[in-house]
Amino acid sequence: HARERLDDLYRPYLDGENVSRYKLTWNGEYVKYGENLAAPRDKEIFEKPRILVRQIPSKSAYAVEAVYTDSDVINDLNSMVITDIQVNPFYLLGILNSRLISLWFFMKFDKFQRRLFPQFKVNELGDFPIPYAMDSQQEEIAKLVEQLMEEMKKDSPDTDIVHQLNLKIDDLVMDLFDLKEEEKQIVRNFVV
């Protein structure tokens, strides 16, 4: 690790704490990425559009912390990488970051009852239910997600805008799962 880019092999480095819901931060560290590493991962996963999912979930109604990036950055093993995205990536991001998926995650894996630092694994991520959606439905969620990501980039995001966008995304996700109004209310009231 280095605090400055010493040559072209040094690339921005992210650890798990740099990955949060809809926002990617960077603490100014670089890593020399190449043959010098004992077990380098395929560098292509760091060069293409992808979703990073933090391995340690938040203990909140929005437990899953995922963000989209197409930047040339290296992430550590505390973030899982989704590169084989078969749908609109912002749609997928909205599903993963939704309150409904957090509730499902909480009930399915019971992570917060067992350990101080709960983690979820790649195979568990593969179990996440991703509903079928027509292109127009994907686009509707994707546009809201992109608005939310833009708001989150600001030094001081407007909490009312963030809250309203989260609610809209959550409602659209619940619609895709055909939840009844009573079921939607259970999801809306979910807290950890």
Located regions from the model:
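Non-catalytic DNA-recognition/assembly elements of restriction-modification systems
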Residues: 9, 17, 130-192
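Polybasic, glycine- and aromatic-enriched phosphate-binding surface used to engage nucleic acids
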Residues: 1-138
